[in-house]
């Protein structure tokens, strides 16, 4: 086992604080509308330019192992805030640095670290409740656009694009961000349920100008099996032909004689048919077939539950207003499924999301919810160069997370004002002893740090602005972009409650642990023995005299 280097008490805390400050100082230059960019060197390719706190934090590794431990613990704050709300990483880092700095001063002055931590925890619990009380719902497109704009570093086009996407696919819809091909940002919206399977034969195409199959008010047959024998399908085909409607077949596969017969029938105009493979594989395919069945009011024909294709009737088939199939995708628009059944299915999938352990599973389940509940929107980010594209894409993703958080828990006044108001309301809060009271004061003082940093980045004097904001009340604050005072919500400067809450909770959690640190242990650097061995070989030169 390698030898260890151990530091105690103030020596350990000073080193740890130095690491915290290096990381936090690098991250906090990005905060606010006048925050600056950070350039990150990559081992290959062009450097990355970013204004995203967590991206900066992830790149930082320090040479001194004790300092690095401090930096890594604050990096955890940024990562956790990012995982919980998708934004607010810089705010969380600034709060953590402020709590640690003030807390360690109190420890150096002889306060009990454990009581300090209890005081900080008590203040944060009370602050979270006050934040919830200040929160207002974020329901209209204007508010959503404002949240998106603020999070995308005051880029109004991004805010409007996200608001438009949310309006079109609903709050539950999936919105994804991709790299575009042009200079302009674009929004593509897919209404209804779309899955990545195209037609099984190009002979099904009935719109040659677009290369697509379009079926109006079709019946939809769902089969969890391979169909190769046409005899199994004859009863259903005859019933559909009598009804005079088109038919979409979604099955594990349609092949051989069955596919050939369907193609011939379609080309002769006897019955309008199209066939596609079911989406997904294994259990996921079964689940997605069931989703389509509920959306279209049909039944999955499956031998597992004793159903046979020959005995299927029109009652077993789903229906939709329209189906569009191209080479790679199938879109079912306006399924006739029962609304309460669809909501029940959505609730069931949400339960699975709660229990999912892997991010991949969670993402796939969320896609299924979106396909049932709304639709899918794709924001294609446009930029002149690849470096700008990456930076802009990261900003759009941040803005998207922030707007989702705003819809979920509402919004509070932005620009660090909400935390200042919360701190003002908690001045009467007390702990069980004097050390806990100091802990409460440490937390309340730290809540001013985001406002001060935003002002500092804008080139103004933080103390003057902080005092002016504290003298006001409600949503009165300082707009660093225009250098004006006023009502933050009226000026469109909003922060999602969830983002502010998460930043405060994660910052205080890690900062509290760091304040109570008394000893740090790390590996001693290893000496390079190979060099010593090589140097020792020099004596071999004397062997020449042995002759």
UniProtKB/Swiss-Prot annotation:
Keyword Cytoplasm: yes
Binding site for ATP: 30-33, 51, 87-91, 415, 479-481, 495
Main location: cytoplasm
Compartments, record wording: Cytoplasm
GO molecular function, one term: ATP-dependent protein folding chaperone
Catalytic activity: ATP + H2O + a folded polypeptide = ADP + phosphate + an unfolded polypeptide
One BP term from GO: protein refolding
Pfam families: Cpn60_TCP1
Keywords: ATP-binding, Chaperone, Cytoplasm, Isomerase, Nucleotide-binding
Enzyme class: isomerase
This enzyme's EC code(s): 5.6.1.7
InterPro entries per UniProt: Chaperonin_Cpn60_CS, Cpn60/GroEL, Cpn60/GroEL/TCP-1, GroEL-like_apical_dom_sf, GROEL-like_equatorial_sf, TCP-1-like_intermed_sf
GO (cellular component) term, any one: cytoplasm
Signal peptide annotation: none
Function text: Together with its co-chaperonin GroES, plays an essential role in assisting protein folding. The GroEL-GroES system forms a nano-cage that allows encapsulation of the non-native substrate proteins and provides a physical environment optimized to promote and accelerate protein folding.
Subunit structure: Forms a cylinder of 14 subunits composed of two heptameric rings stacked back-to-back. Interacts with the co-chaperonin GroES.
HAMAP family for this protein: CH60
Family to which the UniProt record says this protein belongs: Belongs to the chaperonin (HSP60) family.
Protein's name in the database: Chaperonin GroEL
């Amino acid at each position: 086992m390698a030898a260890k280097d151990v530091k105690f008490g103030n020596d350990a805390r000073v080193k740890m604080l130095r690491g915290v400050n290096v990381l936090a100082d690098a991250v906090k230059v990005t905060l606010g509308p006048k925050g600056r960019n950070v350039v990150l060197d990559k081992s290959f390719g062009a450097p990355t330019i970013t204004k995203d706190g967590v991206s900066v934090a992830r790149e930082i590794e320090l040479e001194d192992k004790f300092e690095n431990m401090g930096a890594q613990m604050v990096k955890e704050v940024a990562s956790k805030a990012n995982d919980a709300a998708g934004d607010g990483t810089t705010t969380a880092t600034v709060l953590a640095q402020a709590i640690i700095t003030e807390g360690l001063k109190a420890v150096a002055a002889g306060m009990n670290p454990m009581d300090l931590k209890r005081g900080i925890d008590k203040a944060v619990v009370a602050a979270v409740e006050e934040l919830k009380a200040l929160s207002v719902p974020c329901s209209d497109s204007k508010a959503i656009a404002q949240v998106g704009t603020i999070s995308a570093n005051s880029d109004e086009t991004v805010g409007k694009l996200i608001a438009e996407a949310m309006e079109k696919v609903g709050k539950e819809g999936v919105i994804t961000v991709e790299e575009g091909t042009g200079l302009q940002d674009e929004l593509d919206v897919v209404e209804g349920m779309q899955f990545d399977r195209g037609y099984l034969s190009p002979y099904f195409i009935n719109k040659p100008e677009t290369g697509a199959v379009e079926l109006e008010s079709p019946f939809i047959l769902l089969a969890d099996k391979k169909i190769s024998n046409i005899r199994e399908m004859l009863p259903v085909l005859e019933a559909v032909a009598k009804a005079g409607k088109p038919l979409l077949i979604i099955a594990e596969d349609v092949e051989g004689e069955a596919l050939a017969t369907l193609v011939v029938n379609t080309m002769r105009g006897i019955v309008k048919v199209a066939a596609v493979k079911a989406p997904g594989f294994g259990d996921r395919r079964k689940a997605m077939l069931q989703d389509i069945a509920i959306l279209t009011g049909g039944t999955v024909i499956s031998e597992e539950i004793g159903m046979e294709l020959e005995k299927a009737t029109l009652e077993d088939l789903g229906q939709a207003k329209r189906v569009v199939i191209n080479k790679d995708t199938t879109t079912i628009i306006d399924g006739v499924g029962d609304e309460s059944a669809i909501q029940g299915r959505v609730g069931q999938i949400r339960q699975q999301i709660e229990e999912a352990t892997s991010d991949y599973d969670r993402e796939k389940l969320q896609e299924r919810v979106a396909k049932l509940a709304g639709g899918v929107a794709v924001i294609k980010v446009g930029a002149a160069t690849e470096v700008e594209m990456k930076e802009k894409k990261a900003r759009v993703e941040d803005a998207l997370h922030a707007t989702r958080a705003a819809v979920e828990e509402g919004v509070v006044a932005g620009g660090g004002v909400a935390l200042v108001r919360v701190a003002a309301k908690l001045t009467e809060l007390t702990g069980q002893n004097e050390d806990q009271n100091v802990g409460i004061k440490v937390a309340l003082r730290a809540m001013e740090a985001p406002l001060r940093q935003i002002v500092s980045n804008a080139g103004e004097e933080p103390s003057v602005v902080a005092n002016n904001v504290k003298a006001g009340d409600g949503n009165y604050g300082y707009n660093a972009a225009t250098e004006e005072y006023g009502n933050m919500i009226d000026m469109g400067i909003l922060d999602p409650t969830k983002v502010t809450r998460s930043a405060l909770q994660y910052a205080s959690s890690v900062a509290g642990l760091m304040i109570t640190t008394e000893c740090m242990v790390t590996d001693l650097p290893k000496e390079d023995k190979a060099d010593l061995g090589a140097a020792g070989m020099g004596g071999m030169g004397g062997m020449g005299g042995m002759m």
